[in-house]
Design a protein with these regions (language model features):
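Sec-dependent N-terminal signal peptides
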Residues: 1-25
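A generic "folded-domain core" signal
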Residues: 4, 24-208
Length: 208
């Protein structure tokens, strides 16, 4: 650390301590009887969640419905043709938020009956790819496509048969590998309870 940086750091520390001391020793004038002080913070919800459709503004994502652990999320548009996806937050064994997945329907006739976007942490080992296993079915492997400041993304396609397995299944296990521990893997449980109704709702909304 250079002397200049040390001096700046010390000055900042002293300034902070002085500010705290002043705040502790300066008395706030009492409010008049029956009046509410105007400098009080009433607090706010740290996790306000998504707005409803009526509360959302154009181009804002809103929560349309819940299906067990699945959320139907849509983007409000000016013409009312709000595109929707089926979203689930994935947790590790300790209950920490690790990744997220959003599924959506695709036009009939293509190789993929449904698509999905999976986002993993930036600390993920990309060359290890993403694997998905639905119940006891054969494991499938998917590469990561790109990374943003928020995380690394894999773009997935599911055949009609694979989509049917999701609808009939109990859970899927999505596995990623940490870059800091390439000899270990992280298994994320994706509950499929509510998936069928949720995917039907998304498909119906996107068909409008």
């Amino acid at each position: 650390m250079t002397k200049t940086f040390q001096a700046l750091a010390l000055g900042f520390s002293l300034l902070t301590l002085t500010t705290v001391a002043l705040a502790q020793t300066t008395e706030t004038p009492p409010a008049a009887d029956g009046a509410t002080p105007t400098d009080l913070s009433m607090g706010a919800d740290p996790n306000p969640g998504l707005p409803s459709q009526t509360e959302a503004e154009v181009d804002q994502t809103y929560l349309a419905a819940n299906f067990d652990n699945w959320e139907q999320r849509c983007v409000k548009t000016a013409d009312g043709s709000d595109p929707c996806q089926l979203y689930q937050l994935l947790l590790d064994k300790d209950g920490n938020s690790v990744a997220e997945i959003s599924l959506f329907d695709l036009p009939a006739g293509g190789q993929a009956a449904a698509g999905a976007t999976f986002m993993a942490p930036l600390e993920t080992l990309l060359t290890a790819n993403l694997t998905i296993t639905v119940d006891t079915a054969k494991t499938r492997i998917y590469p990561f496509a790109f990374c943003t400041k928020l995380g690394c993304v894999a773009r997935l396609g599911f055949t009609g048969e694979e989509l049917a397995a999701f609808k009939k299944g109990i859970k899927a296990v999505l596995t990623i590998v940490p870059a800091a521990a390439p000899d270990k893997s992280v298994d994320l449980d994706l509950t499929l309870a509510g998936f069928t109704k949720g995917f039907e709702a998304v498909s119906a909304a996107n068909a409008k």
